[in-house]
Amino acid sequence: MATPLIRVMNGHIYKVPNRRKRKPELKPSEIPTLLGYTASLVDKKWLRLAARRNHG
């Protein structure tokens, strides 16, 4: 049986659960790329998404 001091030192008494982030951080390799799209098509896509977001 462990003494209370050893338990405190091991963190078994004051164990605080880790806070979860709302959105998991994406690694650069996980960001979806738009292959085969021209710059103007990508611009239109992002402008459309931004407009939808502002009105929602």
Curated annotation (Swiss-Prot):
NCBIfam families registered for this protein in UniProt: PRK09689.1 (NF007245)
Highest taxon of source: Viruses
Protein name: Protein ninE
Gene: ninE
Family listed: Belongs to the ninE family.
Organism lineage: Viruses, Duplodnaviria, Heunggongvirae, Uroviricota, Caudoviricetes
